[in-house]
Structures are given as C-alpha cells and as structure tokens.
Amino acid sequence: MTAWTYANIWESVAAAIPDEAAIVQGDRVVSFAAMEAQADALAAHYLKAGLGQQSKIAVYATNCPEFIVAYYGGFKAGLAPFNVNYRYGPEEVRYLLDNGDAEAVVFDAEFASILDPIRGRMPGVKTWIAIAGAGHIVPDWAEDFDAVAARVPAKRPVVAPWGRHNEDLLLIFTGGTTGMPKAVMWQQGDLMAKGGYGANPLLGTPPLGSPEEAGERARATPIKPRSVIAPPLMHATGLIAAFTAIGAGGTVILLPHGKFEPDLFWDAAAKWRATRATIVGQPFAQPLLEALEANPGKWDLSSLFMMGSSGAMWNRENKLGLIRHIPQIQLMDSYSSSEAFGMGISNTNAQGESATAAFALGPDCAIFTEDGRRVEAGSGESGRLAVGGFIPLGYYKDPAKTASTFPTYEGKRWSMPGDWATVEADGTVRILGRGSQCINTGGEKVFPEEVEEALKRHPHVRDAAVTGVPDARFGERIVALVEPHPGVAPDEAELRDHVKGQLATYKSPRHVMVVESVARAPNGKLDYKAIKDRALAAFGAAFGETEGAA
C-alpha cells in the first residue's frame, strides 16, 4: 500500500489539478504543476549533494512559496525537514542546526550575515541554498534557490532508492523560550491519522481511503479551500495549516513581505476570496478586529466561513467582535501544541459562544494528577492535560525530556507537554496554564495566563504578560506588564481591583508595569524568560520581605 506521506498525497493532487493555484503571495501565483516541478528539482539536488535516508534539512526563512517547496522536496526524497526560528541570533542558529544534524540548509539571503560567521563550524552541512529577496543577494558560498529549482530532472517524480514510508519524520523545533529548543519527532503516517486522513466533520467530508484518492477528491471538489495564513510557517500552527490546505487541493495564501500586518491580511483574504484563515489567538485576533473596526465595510469577506486558532489564548469578547463584522464565520479555537495536537476545541459562531479558555476535551484525551491519577469530571481537582493515540515519538536526541513529556499511565503512552486544567461536571475543560510558568505565592499556585486574560478584559488594556519575581517571605509575587491601547494611561490600582473582581485576591498583581509592547514573538507567543528579566530589572531588588501575598 502507498505510504501516508505528504509527498504521496501532494503528488496525487498535483497530477489531478496541475493548473490550479497551490500558493499565492501578493501578485505571485505558484500552480500545483510549478510547485511539483520545483520540488522534484530540490529533491534531486538534495540527493546529488549526498543526503541519505532521513537526513535532516533546515529551512530558515520567512513566509514564502520557497519555504513550502523546500519541505516538499525533502518529503519527496525521504528526508526529514525542520524549522529554524528566524529571530534567533548566530549562536542560537548554530545550536539548532547542530542539534538537528542539518545536512542541507535552505535560507533567506537576508540571513546570510547570521550564517556566515558560523558556517565554518558546521562541517555536516553538505549544501547551502539561498532564497534571493528584495535587496538581498545570494552569497558566493551558497547556491541560488531559483537556479536549483529550475534544474527539473527528466525522470519524475523523484523518489529516493529507499522510497517513502509512514515512518518518515517531520521535525518541529519548539520550546526555545523556557530552555534550549527541542525537536518534536512526528511520523508522517501518525500526522495523517491524527488529522483523520483528510476528513472534515464540519463539511461532512469522509476520510481518504488512500493517498491516491486525494487527487480524485480535489478534482471532484468544485469549491476548494483557500486558506490565508497569518502566523509564520516556522511554527507548527502555520505550517500544518498550509500542509492541510495543499493536501485538500486548496490554495495557501501568504501575506506580502512574509510578515503579519492586519490590513494586508484582510487585503489578501478579500483579494483571493479566502474561505479559511489561520491565526494564533488574541495576539493576531486583536489587531485584526481593530482593523475591521477602523475600516468598516472596506473588505468583502463574504467567502470567509472559518477562522482557526491554536497556540495562544483567544478571548470571548474578541470572538464576538469578529462575528459582528463577519456574521457567517465559524471561530474554531483549538488547544494544541507541537507535542500534542487536539487537546481540546471550542466553536463560536453567531448562534452560540464559548467562554475564554473553555474547551470540549478532545478524543483520546484525559487529565492526570502529578501522581498519575485520572482527574474525574466535576471533582475540582487540577492536573496535566494528556493526549493519547497518535502522538510524537518524542524529542530528537533528548531521551530524558522525552521520558518526562511522554509518560505511560494506565498502560498506554501519553503526550503531556505541561498544560494544567480542570474538568467540570459537564466535561468542559478549563485551561489554567503551562505548569513551567506557574507562580507560587504564599503556597498558592497562580497561572500567568488566567491573570493575563483578566487584565485584557479591561477596556484600556490591549495586551498583558504576567510573571513572578522572588519574594523573601512568600516565595514569589506577581508582576504584570501591561500594553495599553493608544491614547490611554491605565491606573495601576484600578487594574489590580479589576483582577480582584474576577479572580481570587491573591492572584492580583502586586505591581503593574505599563510598557509600550509586551514583545510577543511572530507566532504570537510570549517569551516568559524575557518577561521575567524585565520584571526583575524593574522591581526585583525592591521585593524583599514586605507585603503579603493576598
């Protein structure tokens, strides 16, 4: 039987609808036929350079069609691509390339200045391929991506001597804000199974019976998904959304210049008649709503029926605001991580709404206490969210972290990245936050996310970040960094009282620091190490043995 790999599915789709658009960006259109030819050329180049079965390919670029083609070429040749965070400095990039055992590096030419000082210490890299961009030329030590992609081999599609297998890997580097980055190892066959083999319950689409059926379905589907992607492809949310659209015979819509800007997002959605959109929670949804509020009626969004989010909190008030402007839209809020897809999901539309951080527990999911007991619905206990079934193999070259994140309970293996939650009597899961960020103040556990969400409900607060700093008496005390809406100056006492009106009094921040920006990463996530450093620099020395935790 044909293996469940991205390459096998995408080749089937490309053969069925070669002239349709696979990827668009600005005015640029890449057809399925063009994507197929370029990926074959990349696959042939990787093999000629000496890469072997499951050799690793690093893709170090902003959002662009070449990003997807670089991965596709790797999938064709039975190789294992992985992502590189383009915000990293030289030593961070060197660590990641070394830890990932990169043998090929595909990169934006604008990052040549980062790679040049470290490439001499990367003897395992057999080929460097640069994507030329505006104002950036290909360095003399790298090959031009366009030149490589133009060398389309006569024998196609390209398949390596070792073939393709369900066990072929996709590596997703994650976790750089709380320690060194780690690569999550997903087998492609498990990813396909986790995604229901192309099934879509919302549309009543059944699962595929084989990879070859993907092309038949794409040919027979009159209105294919057109998916506008806001977050970086270098993170799992954007990457998997793009891969899903291509596998369904749809079009991936990337924003011009490769970076998120709310007006450009809505421009692209309207221009290409997007049917779906992918964001990362409130950090993307808030500026998107602000753009709609500032420009009522500017964009025709009548084709947009679904917006999906994963990776960050997305509050109820924002969802209702988006629905006011796009009344037909379904807002699908998924609680997932690179290690654990599908921990929970909520759906908000004009007919009904979900509370912030409230989800229906996903299939094959559970909550376990620290001693391995299953948390029963309505018990009031909290524990770590766990996903069973199709889960990653673990972290690449990190058996200790693999053992702690993928434990065995009740005789089966689970993925437990560290998200704490409770489950109510009706089965609704309430997310508390990531355990690694938990603040212990006077013996009480406080999760930053719940305080952040409470602060963001204040009309003067655009965004917020919460951390703990050492306290001689109570262990830690809570500090909030608050990013206000333009033209307002939040009052610290008012904000503290605002939190006390929603949460236990000990969860109210002891100090509120008004900042220009909480400095979220491009994927919408907070760098809690940097936030703690900012709080310590401002208030750490002042927090001695005074004041209580409540």
Stretches with model-predicted labels:
Residues 152-173, 180, 216-226:
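Conserved pre-ATP/AMP-binding loop-to-beta segment of ANL
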Residues 2, 21-64, 71-72, 89-94:
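Conserved AMP-binding/adenylate-forming core of the ANL superfamily
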Residues 31-33, 169-207:
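Conserved AMP-binding A3 loop
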Residues 88, 94-95, 105-107, 316, ...:
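AMP-binding/adenylate-forming catalytic core of the ANL superfamily
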Residues 366-386, 425-426, 488-492, 527:
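Conserved beta-loop-beta connector loops within the AMP-binding
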Residues 48-49, 79-151:
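Structural core segment of the AMP-binding/adenylate-forming
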Residues 193-230, 234-276, 291, 295:
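Conserved AMP-binding/adenylation subdomain of ANL enzymes
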Residues 146-147, 247-250, 274-279, 289-354, ...:
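Gly/Ser/Thr-rich phosphate-binding loop
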